[in-house]
Amino acid sequence: MIVETGHFALILALCVALVQAVIPLVGAQKGWSGWMAVATPAALAQFGLIAIAFAALTYAFVTSDFSLKLVYENSHTDKPMLYKVTGVWGNHEGSMLLWVLILAMFGAAAAAFGGALPERLRARVLAVQGTIGVAFLVFVLFTSNPFLRLEEAPFNGRDMNPLLQDPGLAFHPPFLYLGYVGLSMAFSFAVAALIEGRVDAAWARWVRPWTLAAWIFLTIGIALGSWWAYYELGWGGFWFWDPVENASLMPWLLAAALLHSAIVVEKREALKSWTILLAIMAFGFSLIGTFLVRSGVISSVHSFANDPERGVFILFILAFFTGGALTLYAARASEMQAKGLFSMVSRESALVMNNVLLAVAALVVFTGTVWPLIAELFWDRKLSVGAPFFEKAFTPFMVGLALLLPLGSMMPWKRASLGKLVRPLLPALVLTLAVLALVWVMATGRPMLALGAAGLGAWILFGALAEIWQRAGRTPGRILRLPRADWGKAFAHGGLGIVFAGVGLLMAGQVEDIRVAKAGDSFEVAGYTITLVSVEDVPGPNFTAKTATMEVRQGGKLVATLHPEKRIYPVQAMPTTEADIDNGFWRDVYLVIGDPQEGGGWAVRTYVKPFANWIWAGCLLMAFGGGLSLTDRRYRSAAGARRATVADAVAAE
């Protein structure tokens, strides 16, 4: 009965979404306040109904209701409770239900906290959100229904993919979806602005918090996925340039560009058309990523589903929303003329360059991701585009961004003087040169890569600190009184610098050793003595494992005792490799036990990875900085609304 209630709630949610999509839009066009007022209760009701449906599906997983097809295919009575819950979204149907839940949640948040918005703008934004909700609810109900019953309930289920039974991956999809779907708010604001023919400083102030929130969630989601790949898959890498990974990177880059261009609209009322285009394309690339992950048109090491019928449906959604928005953009963008003028050397120009670099970087990732599909369609050639292409094509744009970032942050609006600009950055430049000298003395492996990474990372980090010092008027007592947005910007930029340094130094200095070892054998890797003490059978809650005990020593002193595993999940008869890592500030010692070899030995892989944890520490700092900025009172206030002189004005400029 609970499952049927959830299914019925999902159908009702579709009906409410239809009302939300049509009635407020007509009301805004006609100026009927009563019709526009329907948007808020409809958005709240839609969220409540989808939450009921999601709760019903969660209940079915927790209680192991194997009469439900989805539970049978993705759960088992022996599975730990955490993975019973995360199994709700560890599959295509459940993940799409989570998608529409988050979509409705953002719409409900806009309805609940959007009281400062002009009445017509709020109605149109919520109507666009409702239209997106209609499309995805139809997709869920007709192609991906999570509430289908089996004629006879089996005694037990088939279990979830063992690779997904991990705490890191349990929370990776929700954060990623919060980012993907969060960009729908920027899209809805962009389409509403195009309908009204109005983009001004107030609009930019309204759209920035939603974009920033989506960017924060994407940052956390990408970091969690990368961290999971690093420690769970056993290959020692953190980014594979796989289509599924690229699907999240592209909207992240465009969301970052949108954040910076919206600042120019807010402060100088320039880049209006470009900002609208970025808002459309950021969500458009979220839909493109969804299509790539779920259609099966491109081979991926971890695609979610390979169903051409679903892929065609998602392609239709992509074409309808992105194509429709771009058509509207082509018709109305010319009305949004820029007001603010600026010189070639100014903060506006630096932000334009920032946008160009980020947008072209996203285009490079997109080209490399879809090129195998293009080659097969037009030339009937099967090929793959791997890490070498992306590293060579993507890296130059990131290097340019790193060099520009501290300079642009210090520039004043409208016009800047190079002489006045360089002076506050001299301490940052001196400290960067000191870091370069230190790395030059200590670097091994690929010293030029290490120098470049350390130099760029230090330049960004020290540049962020120099900006904080400059904004405080070079007075220590004023530093802590700076607005949270200033501190958030410094943390986010500094975190990016740490990521730059971590990625480059890891790639320059990592050491890999692959060998066969027997119990009692010791061997040397990068100054560490590794001893394989034993390999034993250890039972788990829903798996059996060959667990190795391995000691790591340095200079005769025991540093760590690690226990890498080779697991077998009997329900799916699937082996997995569980690495064990001695995490450190300066390096990771990463051990993997492989298959047994002839003569009683075991395949053993050892990696020593310098500065690996700096990558995820930098990502967390970026997300923290974004969150700190989001708590700034200037984001929470309705100042933008107060600056809108006529709430119902349709055309301006």
UniProtKB/Swiss-Prot annotation:
Keyword Transmembrane helix appears in the UniProt entry? yes
Q: Where in the cell is it found?
A: Cell inner membrane
Q: What is its main location?
A: membrane
Q: What are the protein's UniProt keywords? A: Cell inner membrane, Cell membrane, Cytochrome c-type biogenesis, Membrane, Transmembrane, Transmembrane helix
TM spans, by residue?
A: 8-28, 42-62, 97-117, 125-145, 175-195, 210-230, 245-265, 273-293, 311-331, 358-378, 393-413, 425-445, 449-469, 491-511, 610-630
Can you supply one Gene Ontology CC term for this chain's record?
Answer: plasma membrane
Q: Which GO terms describe its molecular function?
A: heme binding; heme transmembrane transporter activity
Membrane topology (UniProt): Multi-pass membrane protein
Single Gene Ontology BP term? cytochrome complex assembly
Q: What does this protein do?
A: Required for the biogenesis of c-type cytochromes. Possible subunit of a heme lyase.
Q: Which family does it belong to?
A: Belongs to the CcmF/CycK/Ccl1/NrfE/CcsA family.
Name the UniProt record assigns to this protein: Cytochrome c-type biogenesis protein ccl1
| Gene designation | ccl1
